[in-house]
């Protein structure tokens, strides 16, 4: 098979290699498509100790379950030959959080596509035993490129559930990448009175509005003040009741506190770079306005299932967020497209 090996920071080589060996308790996946996640991009451009060179990234795969080990424990609705997607957070299934259905918070979780599990920027990918329970069947007519958004969309859904939007709330989303786009759609579906979208990049904001503008009341480019003045002008100085920070930015994290209404809920969805994870935040904003500031990470099995329904019902709108598709041999162009801000969701099709 052919696979894309990350051989160094900003270096990738597509070459022939052996097909992954079938684990008796695992499976193999004939990859139809695999999305490039922001985590993949950060690893490609900065390196990550969990991805020792040479390494195959890719943790948003969909494809056909090609081989199934004789001792594999598959979900009841999955069998060999099925088209499936693979949820990326690999969990123990036994800790307190797994038992409560909060698999994203598993005390011993691992991430598919990182050591010790090579990813799916390849023609064939291994499904290790710990990942078989994460296989979820796809609707038969769902295109592979759209199906790759199942994993990040489920994460966006988790962020929206943590945000807990009330009927008529003003919702502000900072960051107009794929997550911000999908959260705008879901915020509207959940009864938000106003949905606002902001980004530091005009080009990315324009692409987002072309994709999901029907769910957005207004949008603007964030200036040096992080778009605080624009939001306050639109809310008569009150601020937003619900804010999602869907951009990995310390400035956005601070601006969110300034733009929050009293007793608002602010969710930090996007993680910061591992080498620079600390924000200088004005805690008096939190204190005097009685803000609830929360994090959101990953997705649960329940949210993966809800996502399948969303992808079936809102196909055209959600598909518009997938702006670029590249063959495996052009994966470097895919990473460059993300870094330049020239696209929203980028998909690799082996």
Where are these regions (language model features)?
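Short amphipathic alpha-helix with an adjacent loop that forms part of the alpha/beta core around
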Residues: 226-237
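C-terminal hydrophobic helical "lid"/dimerization subdomain
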Residues: 1, 226, 254-258, 301-350
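NAD(P)H dinucleotide-binding glycine-rich loop of Rossmann-like/cofactor-binding domains
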Residues: 92-174
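Glycine-rich beta-strand-centered segment in the early N-terminal region that forms part
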Residues: 20-34, 48-96, 139-141
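Mid-domain Rossmann-like dinucleotide-binding core that forms the NAD(H)/NADP(H) cofactor-binding site
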Residues: 81, 140-224
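Glycine-rich phosphate-binding loop and adjacent beta-alpha segment
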Residues: 250-313, 350
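N-terminal glycine-rich cofactor-binding segment
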Residues: 3-21, 38-67, 85-86, 106-116
